[in-house]
């Protein structure tokens, strides 16, 4: 971001962006040019935050959304389809549990809830259709801890990625990617925001997957775009 030496970065209050010419516009819509198109899928102010969160978590890329649930749904809807399965911990934030129980079931995705403090229970729940392992650690609301390395290694042995909700700890106290997780999600409304004055979410992970979450998960499924004000 070019800030002209400003100590505080500018807030880009634009819905759309101009192209130098038609050819550049075509390249951007085709994903061949990294410039901006529409603030619903990318904004310079939001991109600055995304870069910093990716750096803090030690990930390749990040996607910021309008809320934590926006991050979770945009990410998961990009990773599974009808007939797939998810193995999730039995202790989850209530709204996340609601998405798993109602939203995903309506799309033909099966979610198996197990005690993830017991790796054997996770192993028993994994099938050839399992596409994702999901947990919170510490979990909401009972603060239960999960051995992330053990679960991540178990998933890796079956070719299944682990997604961890790191809302409670933030990267200041815990970096799940360093323990083998593939994805990290946050409700940035809480400890990352810190002051109770914003709503935001984030997902961090491999650049290719984050791009799909941006252009499919947010752009086509949830519309959970983050405001540049937040």
Model regions and ranges:
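N-terminal glycine-rich, Lys/His-bearing helix-loop that initiates the first secondary-structure elements
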Residues: 1-33
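Alpha-helix initiation/capping motif
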Residues: 2, 38-42, 115, 202
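Selective for proline/serine-rich intrinsically disordered segments
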Residues: 7-8, 42, 79, 136
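Residue-level marker of positions within ordered structural domains that often coincide
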Residues: 18, 58, 206
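Conserved N-terminal alpha-helix of the aminotransferase class I/II PLP-enzyme fold
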Residues: 21-70, 97-103
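Conserved PLP-enzyme active-site core in the AAT-like
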Residues: 62-230
């Amino acid at each position: 971001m070019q800030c002209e030496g400003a100590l505080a970065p500018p807030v880009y209050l634009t819905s759309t962006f101009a192209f130098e010419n038609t050819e550049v516009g075509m390249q951007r819509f085709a994903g061949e040019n990294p410039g901006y198109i529409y603030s619903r899928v990318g904004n310079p102010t939001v991109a600055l935050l995304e870069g910093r969160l990716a750096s803090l978590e030690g990930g390749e890329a990040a996607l910021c959304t309008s809320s934590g649930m926006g991050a979770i749904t945009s990410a998961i809807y990009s990773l599974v389809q009808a007939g797939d399965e998810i193995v999730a911990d039995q202790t989850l934030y209530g709204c996340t549990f609601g998405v798993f129980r109602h939203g995903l079931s309506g799309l033909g995705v099966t979610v198996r809830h197990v005690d993830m403090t017991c790796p054997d229970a996770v192993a028993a729940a994994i099938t050839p259709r399992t596409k994702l392992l999901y947990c919170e650690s510490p979990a909401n609301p009972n603060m239960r801890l999960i051995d992330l390395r053990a679960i991540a290694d178990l998933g890796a042995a079956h070719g299944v990625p682990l997604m961890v909700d790191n809302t409670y700890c933030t990267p200041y106290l815990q970096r799940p990617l360093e323990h083998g997780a593939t994805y990290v999600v946050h409700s940035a409304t809480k400890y990352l925001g810190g002051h109770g004055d914003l709503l935001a979410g984030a997902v961090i992970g491999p650049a290719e997957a984050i791009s799909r979450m941006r252009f499919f998960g947010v752009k086509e499924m949830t519309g959970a775009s983050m405001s540049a004000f937040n």
